[in-house]
Amino acid sequence: MRFGLNIDHIVTLREIRKTYEPEILEALFIAKNTHKVDLITIHLREDKRHIQNEDVLRLLEISPLPINIECSINVAITDFLCSLKNKPSKVTIVPENRNEVTTEGGLDCSLKGLGEVIRAYHNKGIEVSLFVDPLKDALHFAKEHQVKQVEFHTGVYANLHNALYSNANNQIHAISALKDKCPKELKEELHNAFLQLRRMSKEAFFMGIVVCAGHGLNYTNVKELLKIPSLRELNIGHSVVSKAVLVGLEKAILEMAQLIKR
């Protein structure tokens, strides 16, 4: 299993104060020196709430690890990434809403202009992945557009798992739609969410599409996903950075790697 470390929220801390620390390159080399991280993931958002264009340039110039850049189909961002001298190892196209706190679901593959953006990256020799819900239609769209990777949105699975097996439902930011559900109902929905991820991962495998997954994964809910044999990569960020605040980034990375690289 490949471990993609998302370091967006290292930069979130920097941007809150509009200062120079924490240094994104230091985080990069801490990750590299653990010898457990396979790639670095960053999300270049339209509103630049964390990662900035300059961060992209610096990372691509010196990173010893592959860089996966998440982004929308925004024209300015597409043009910027296509113009880069140092190319990312892949671009993962994600949906984006300026009012969202974080990505809320998978990409709508009927989105106008999506095919053109995929072709623009392919023409520059940049591999494309699509951040999608685990659905057949998304896989067929990927196949039709010569996209060799998808990343399944695991938010539904992760939220249900957290509601059942953590104190998430007792916290200030509990998800209202899950808070009042009984454990039996949550277990059934969680089981169905897992089965859907497993079914669509198998489907993708037989279609020749590499399957990655991410969103909302943490030290507890990630374990079940390791039972999906066709899953090749997990991208995890917020939970690792959250733990790093308390125990340090190196230890937080190693603890996650111990779970997913068994």
UniProtKB/Swiss-Prot annotation:
Homooctamer; tetramer of dimers. It catalyses: 3-amino-2-oxopropyl phosphate + 1-deoxy-D-xylulose 5-phosphate = pyridoxine 5'-phosphate + phosphate + 2 H2O + H(+). Its EC number is 2.6.99.2. GO terms for cellular component: cytosol. Pathway: Cofactor biosynthesis; pyridoxine 5'-phosphate biosynthesis; pyridoxine 5'-phosphate from D-erythrose 4-phosphate: step 5/5. Catalyzes the complicated ring closure reaction between the two acyclic compounds 1-deoxy-D-xylulose-5-phosphate (DXP) and 3-amino-2-oxopropyl phosphate (1-amino-acetone-3-phosphate or AAP) to form pyridoxine 5'-phosphate (PNP) and inorganic phosphate. Its main location: cytoplasm. 1-deoxy-D-xylulose 5-phosphate binds at residues 8-9, 45, 50, 102. Belongs to the PNP synthase family. The record marks 151 as: Transition state stabilizer. It is found in: Cytoplasm. SUPFAM superfamilies: Pyridoxine 5'-phosphate synthase (SSF63892). This is Pyridoxine 5'-phosphate synthase. The active site is at 43 (proton acceptor), 70 (proton acceptor), 215 (proton donor). Keywords: Cytoplasm, Pyridoxine biosynthesis, Transferase. One of its GO terms (biological process) is pyridoxine biosynthetic process.
